[in-house]
Amino acid sequence: MSSAPPFAAALAWSGHLRRRLDAHPDLAAWLANACAHPVSANVLAAWQAELSGPDAPEVLPVEQCRGMLRKLRERVFLTLIVRDLGGQADLEEVVGAMTVLADIAVGTAYRSVAAELAAVHGLPREQSTGDPQEMLIVGMGKLGGRELNVSSDIDLVMLYGDEGETDGPRRISNHEFYGRLTRRMMPALSEVDADGQVFRTDLRLRPDGDAGPLAWSLDALEHYLIGQGREWERYAWLKARLMPAQAFADSNPDAQARQLESLRVPFVYRKYFDFDALAALRALRERIRQDWQRRALARNGVDSANNIKLGDGGIREIEFIVQLSQLIRGGRMPALQRRGLLEALHAERAAGLVPEGDAQKLEAAYRFLRRTEHALQYREDEQTHLLPADPAQRAALAAALGYEPAAFERTLAEHRAFVSQTFRNAFRLAGMGEEDDSPAPARTHANGHAMRPHAGALHDIEERLAGQIQRDFPEHAEDLLRRTETLLGSHRVRSLPDSSRHRLEALLPAALTAAAQTSAPMDAALRLFDLIETIAQRSAYLALLAEYPDTLARVARMVAASPWAAQYLTQHPLLLDSLIDWRTLFEPLDFAQVAHQLAADLDACRLPDGEPDIERQMNLMRDVQRQASFQLLAQNLEGELTVEKLADQLSALADLLLAETIRRVWPLVNRRPGAEPHLAVIAYGKLGGKELGYASDLDLVFLFDDDREDAAELYAKLGRRMTSWLSTMTSSGRLYEVDLRLRPDGDAGLLAVSLEAFEQYQRSHAWPWEHQALTRARYAAGDTEAGARFERIRADILVMPRDVQALRGEVLGMRDKISAGHPNRSELFDVKHDRGGMVDVEFVTQYLVLCHAATHRVLVNNLGNIALLRLAGEAGLIPAPLALAAGDAYRTLRRAQHQLRLKGVDKARVPPGQLAAERATVCELWQTVLQDGTIAQAEVK
């Protein structure tokens, strides 16, 4: 038995290693050589080939397969003991080697057993193609996450695609074939013989557990997950991975792999908030808390502190902390959909869900506990997680891990204390409430009585609501009673299952109470009832509002303040759960973080073959836009944002989404490897002027600066795909309406135009109104060099010499056309289109820019109407007091328009006396600049 330095730490700790070397002295030389190199996939493949023998057939007989796999497992285990305890192997090498071993073992056993069965029964075949049909072997838990410990069992689920039968002389059904195959595989992997075993194998995570068939068809799995799948099964399927096992030549399981992933992802990662799921996850956390205590009592009171997996602050708690955020938020943030724990933790840190310091501490604790776990298992090749109680053995463990006993105990205690505290606060960390030592929110009616678990029929709740309405809404009782009757009589409510109806009965009185406490009680009550009727079929949202009274109160305040906000929430109930964490909703939007996370999430939207999942990507971008807009809306309604700041934020959001759209669409149209898009997206109109509203269209022009031969066709195709990406209605709605009519030659022109052609058009063919529009244009997204070139062209066009009188006539004529196109036959003042309204200010500003930018270059800058008017006043182009007054008037008009939009008004009109002073100021500006016709000729002295 050698005592060479590489073996010293391992021999001192591992009785298993000592016994193997005593029994096989020649093993020491082999091991000394093997432990000099990392245990990689290539190393395992070489060992497998060596152990199989030089003349081995491509598919080993089952008995030969059994022996080879057990010897391979011993090589891996012994080499890892030496490398790990000698400080040569990190955690990634250890768990990676064990996972590769499992993949090899399962794949090899599958091929061997399948060949024996096929020789008797023939091959199972796909019904549609007739091709051989593989069994789909799914690795669950740590096997799925590629993080097996060194003495782990493996959890498998066996699936297959089509029903049907084999093609041999003794035909059996595919179902029976895969069942027999599974049954015969198990001894090859888990039976203990003279060479030991490969892996203990557990099939109980399949649907129905031990009571169910050994192998399930994908259709049966789908029915099970949809109809009976439980929350702990979501947790189990999170790491599920299709293993690389293929037994039949000419088979192609890609379609089945895609089908499996299309079942797994929406089952595990739900797009919509689900209170039932949250409650089940809370219960799962309590089970984790209590599981070891029960086991400890059954084992004569073993202290749970000795179990580094199930005890307080153990590995299982770290797994729950990380996977909780994945389960709650992974449906909307695909970047969190990682099977590996550390990968998921890193993704959560990058997404801002886990503070940097906490993430580092969790990772350090995980690495420490996993290494300790492996050391415990190296000792006697046992699946144990119990720290030795004997002080001498404990000191030996510390030494094996490179610690002094006191330092080991201190480090262990620090890690476990941090993990335990974080575990208790896991739901707060995931953004789902405060510290969880407090009881769950009480399920009460608005009158304070506890919600009856078996409430009466709908007429009972109607009677209770009637009394509440007459008490709290006496002036509007009749109208509200009528609305209550229609709500309770609607098909959506009548068809609710009992559980949802009970929630509705709890929610409606609470909604009336919340509405009564707002600034517009009747409006709030009616709008809340509209919202509730819309979401009635989604029990998760009923539960959310019923179980979180603070959230319901926030919704009530929002809908009371703005019918437009009420409509927005009704159309996009996905946003409701963002109201749970009110503080987060009022944090300023970090556009750099939004862009980073969006890119990561879009990158993660992949089909099983690695191609981008375009539908998921398009929906994700829409969901992100809705969430960000809703965050701004909440801040807007609480008075946190001015109209100007809000428009800046909405415009920045649109720019960000345009840039990401280019990145996602370009690979779909470009076939030249390595080519980058030289496209500049030019924003006109409201987006160009950074005056975007919640529901504004995007006025865009696509310009390119690329000399490749197919540039015109390529960028036209890119423009079409971008427009479709932005404006197509998907299950998540439409991102933006897009208007491309401001491009050269309008609808008759090319969809994308070269910068040279754009410049030539602007110099020689553009109408004056197109130069007016150019004053508000800006580079918004795309190639920065092309964007800079556009800005230079724009500046050159704006400073061109012009016939002032002719320009004045054109501007007046265009203003008349706009008035004719927006007739106002009411007595109200249209704050945008009527004389003295916003359009007059915009036209005056554009006229001043086109007249004077050549001599006052500062006017070239796209600074917005208010800033440009002020600069014109400072330059003496208009009276400075009038410039400031007109800017203030324009700001007031915009604010009035915005408030009316929030009230759901289609046309922003007010009584004629309401904005009389502002209207008079704008009329004076118009008269001074365009009617008198003198300001354009000379500067004001």
Swiss-Prot record:
Task: Give the keywords, sorted.
Answer: ATP-binding, Magnesium, Multifunctional enzyme, Nucleotide-binding, Nucleotidyltransferase, Transferase
Q: Which Pfam families match?
A: GlnD_UR_UTase, GlnE
* Region annotated Adenylyl transferase, chain positions: 447-941
The lineage's top-level taxon is Bacteria
Q: Select a single GO molecular function from the record's annotations and give it.
A: [glutamine synthetase]-adenylyl-L-tyrosine phosphorylase activity
Q: Name one GO biological process term.
A: regulation of glutamine family amino acid metabolic process
InterPro entries, sorted: GlnE (IPR023057), GlnE_rpt_dom (IPR005190), NT_sf (IPR043519), PII_UdlTrfase/GS_AdlTrfase (IPR013546)
Kindly state which reaction or reactions the protein catalyses.
Answer: [glutamine synthetase]-O(4)-(5'-adenylyl)-L-tyrosine + phosphate = [glutamine synthetase]-L-tyrosine + ADP; [glutamine synthetase]-L-tyrosine + ATP = [glutamine synthetase]-O(4)-(5'-adenylyl)-L-tyrosine + diphosphate
Q: Which residues form a coiled coil?
A: none
* A GO-annotated cellular component: cytosol
HAMAP family in the record? GlnE
Its protein name is Bifunctional glutamine synthetase adenylyltransferase/adenylyl-removing enzyme
Organism whose genome encodes this protein: Bordetella parapertussis (strain 12822 / ATCC BAA-587 / NCTC 13253)
